[in-house]
Regions:
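Short, low-complexity N-terminal intrinsically disordered segments enriched in polar/charged residues
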Residues: 1-35
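A beta-strand edge to alpha-helix "cap/lid" segment located at domain peripheries
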Residues: 2-4, 71-143
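A structural signal for alpha-helical segments
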Residues: 6-9, 50-53, 110
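Intrinsically disordered, low-complexity segments enriched in polar/charged residues with Gly/Pro
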Residues: 9-11, 28-30, 37, 70-73, ...
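Residues at helix-coil transition
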Residues: 26, 38-39, 124
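A solvent-exposed, acidic/Ser-Thr-rich amphipathic alpha-helical stretch
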Residues: 32-88, 93-98
Length: 143
């Protein structure tokens, strides 16, 4: 196992970024979520689906995906943990994150699932962190 050469302040910056990004997603603020990606960022979150490309494409994909919850008072929470960062030659970061999605309905018991691994390429800019690409793999789909 290699030791990461990512500075602690950068690691903390990425954790804060993920917290804000997931809170935007869970609150249904899809434009805010999409703005955490580069202009040409890619987002692939469902097995077998084509990636959404660009911020407008990401918003459209999230709106399409969440239509299934239109008449359902469900609250979904994305829990990111075990963030592993590795510097890439171009100055960006490879990020591998374990993710659990917790779903709860009023008066119900929280349910955990799916269990996923998030593979990101992150850019650190003067303005902060942006996601260049995201591929989400689902553990239940593993061979």
């Amino acid at each position: 196992m290699s030791v990461s050469t990512v500075r602690p302040d950068v690691y903390a910056q990425v954790q804060h970024f993920y917290a804000r990004q997931m809170q935007a997603l869970d609150a249904g603020r899809f434009a805010d979520y999409a703005n955490t990606f580069t202009e040409d960022g890619t987002f692939q979150h469902s097995p077998g689906a084509q990636p959404a490309v660009g911020r407008a494409g990401i918003v459209a994909e999230l709106e399409r995906f969440h239509e299934r919850f239109a008449d359902d008072p469900v609250q979904r929470r994305h829990w990111f943990n075990h963030v592993a960062l590795e510097p890439l030659p171009d100055g960006s970061l490879s990020s591998t994150v374990y993710a659990l999605i917790v779903t709860v309905r009023p008066g119900g018991t929280p349910k955990i699932g799916p269990s996923c691994v998030v593979h990101d390429v992150l850019e650190i800019t003067e303005e902060g962190v942006l996601t260049r690409s995201r591929l989400v793999t689902h553990d239940q789909e593993a061979a």
